[in-house]
């Protein structure tokens, strides 16, 4: 390739923030739940580069074809590869693509095709655009991808803080705020903020794991009822203080079934395959979380409060889709 920017190229990163920044100098975009990917195109040669510099072409052949369908022959894009089903981003389906079997990748590309959503233009033709302010790069990006009406998507953007706030309550993963006058800084956490969408759910406490210290609880395993009235595991909550870990065992005592397990097709489990002990489905907690994969909370949830006013059967799986 003879592009003005060479690979590998580190993407610009964002710092975490709790709320949307205010002021005329900010622009806002929705946060996507996919694989951050830098796209290099020089004629018929397209290369997809992951956030950590690894090649991604073999996992997403349909994205390569989407880039080749763009009129622009020489460019470098920053964006995200995503899989959407019925308007919902499905990170678990996306993750299944990272597999050594080419036949599996080809099948998944047909069944659940991925798409590329562009949110920055880093080079066009012989011109590197890193030094240009974000607002100018954005305008040029709109032209290159035909406002997202072509084969490659264009992330929405607004300078209206109130309008951006909708992305903290809708189907997106949150908001990325960018300084409109800032250049693109590869590998730097500057001029960009990420504000995650924090969701809450009321969950049944279906089991627990013991803590490292005797007589303590390490985590609570959470469940929600599906349409068939089955209690399905959706994740866990931990991070309790030392005093709370000791008090929890007393609170759970009268609900213990003494059924134990460490995984299996129909048992409560986590990636760590730690031993759990079952509980009667009678206790309800409210938790906060920010990511889901399918019907599971992808990262550990945060405990908010006990819900003595809530019946376990009111804790439905549909909460994870709202």
Regions found by a protein language model. Give the residues of each.
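Catalytic cores of nucleic-acid ligases and guanylyltransferases
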Residues: 1-322
